[in-house]
Swiss-Prot record:
GO cellular component: ribonucleoprotein complex; ribosome
Name by which UniProt lists this protein: Large ribosomal subunit protein uL23
Matches recorded under InterPro entries: Nucleotide-bd_a/b_plait_sf, Ribosomal_uL23-like, Ribosomal_uL23/eL15/eS24_sf, Ribosomal_uL23_CS
Domain of life, source organism: Bacteria
Underlying gene: rplW
């Protein structure tokens, strides 16, 4: 059993993009920014507990940080982890529906 404190730290924010909204409409998949050290099991447990929906599968990937310039200084943004969470049939979770 994963502790509740950990579950609250796993999910960072919804990732809102054109690709994410298309995935929600077509395949009932939500896209989330998650903690870099989060596992698929932790992500699944956190989504099920916090949003009270049934999760079918979780796919994750690490997004590499971009190199950015500020004047002559060159810096790099941090890497972050993205999770595609597919919900079971009949389940619904809409982050961007009210934005229209």
């Amino acid at each position: 059993m994963i502790r509740e404190e950990r579950l609250l730290k796993v999910l960072r924010a919804p990732h809102v993009s054109e690709k994410a909204s298309t995935a929600m409409e077509k395949t009932n998949t939500i896209v989330l920014k998650v903690a870099k050290d989060a596992t698929k099991a932790e992500i699944k447990a956190a989504v099920q507990k916090l949003f009270e929906v049934e999760v079918e599968v979780v796919n994750t990937l690490v997004v590499k940080g971009k190199v950015k310039r500020h004047g002559q200084r060159i810096g790099r943004r941090s890497d972050w982890k993205k999770a595609y969470v597919t919900l079971k049939e009949g389940q619904n979770l809409d982050f961007v529906g009210g934005a229209e």
